[in-house]
Structures are given as C-alpha cells and as structure tokens.
Amino acid sequence: MSQPTSAPNTATSAPPLDAQVARLLGESKMIIVCGPGGVGTTTSAAALGVAAARHFDKRVLVLTVDPAKRLATALGLAALGNVELPVQVASARGSLTMAMIDTKSSWDDMIRRHAPDDAIRDRVLANDLYKTLTSRFVHSHDYVVTERLFDARESGKFDLVIVDTPPSRSAVSVLDAPRRMQQFFGSRLLKLLTAPTQSRLLSLASRPFFIVADRILGAAFLSDIAEFFTLFRTMEAPIVARARRVGSLLSDSATSYVVVTSAEPVALNEAGY
C-alpha cells in the first residue's frame, strides 16, 4: 500500500514561472525595468530578481537608480548603499545581490578611473564646482548610472543585472546619458570654456550672460568653472570611448526592457513616454 505523499513546503518552494517571464529571465543578461511612479516598478524589479535567483542557476544583481530608495523597502531591508549586499532567497538555485547607486561616490570612482594622472584627479575631486554638481545637481546621476551598469556587466561577477529605474521620464534621461555625454565633449560651450585663458576671457566678456554672471557671481567663480571643465576635458578620450560602449550595451540583443504600468490614463500616458 502506497504511503501518502507529503504536501510541498509552500514557504520555500518556488511557484512555477509564466513562460514569457521564464524566457525573459533565461535569455537576458540585463533587464531594465521602467514605468511611471507608483505602479510597482520597484516591486517588479525586486520580484524579477528573486524569481531569477530561485529558478535559474544565475548570479543576479538588482540595482536601483531610483533616488527615492524604495528597493530596500520592497525587499524588507533596512537600507541599501553603494556597496553590493547579498540577499538570502529561499530555495534559490542561484544567488541574489542588491545595490543602490550613490551618485557622489560613483562620480568619484569615475574620476579616479579616467584621470590621466594623480594631480588632475586630486584637483577635480577638490574642485568646489565638481562637489556641487555631483552632490546637488538633479541630473548628475544620469551618466554614472550607465557607467555602473556597464561595470556590473563587464565585471564577470553577475550573469543577470536587473535595473530599477526612476519614473519614466527620468528613466529616458538616464538611458540617453551616453549620447549626451558624447555630444557634450563636442559642444561649442566646452570648447569656449577650455580655450586658452586670454582668448576665453575676451570671448566671455563680450557675451551678455557672462557679463551678468560676472557681476552676480564674481570673476573667481567663473574662473573655477573654466578650471573644472579644463581638467574634465583631459578625460575626454576614455570617457567618450566608454560612453560609446555603454550605448552599445543598452541596445544589445541581450538587454531587455520591461515597462510596468496600470490601467489609469495618466499612468498609461507616462509609460508610453
């Protein structure tokens, strides 16, 4: 007489995956989760990470670039920082790691990587304008986010990187950052700011904006701006080359995009953006 079989341990056994989700997790090397605010984008990114770790023998990183820092809450964690934090997943075949991008630390890492020598590195890191831009400027995280994604893919530490982005319009800004960085190094403004000192000052002095800025901010501040961009331009070659590689990564066939939305008209419109 056969013995009754025991019921599965639902607390630890992984529920079956939808076929499309299984294909997404199985074939992708990077998944970028986008959508309007308040529809569950962060929760979806976290759920995909847990599912990938449970059902596949993959090393998974879920990386949040959302300044609201909701990923830690979605996973029941006290906090996330700029370091990678292992997360225990029941019945996992693979592993799950979480991290949040700290903008200032990521910029500092990028400068240390690309500066041509220690002297320029130290001058940039000590520059007051640099500190302000990387700590307070609303779009300062856009480019370093894509750098961090590239690092995660190239490190060889992870088989799948899942990215929790800010609400849709901010996500578009992040994904467009490599192209904008390349354009910036070719811009007339950068050439003007980094021209030889005498010709730069003569040119600036003739422009109404800089005449007003000089009166309000002072010549010293304008000089600091010019110094910062002159130093930053010494890193043009490695940063532009890196931006091109990041752009290629974002359009790679192994990179997938998931748009999360709700049936609300406002959310649908935002998701379509």
Where are the predicted features?
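Flexible phosphate-sensing "switch/lid" loops adjacent to ATP/NTP-binding sites
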Residues: 2-32, 39, 44-252, 256-263, ...
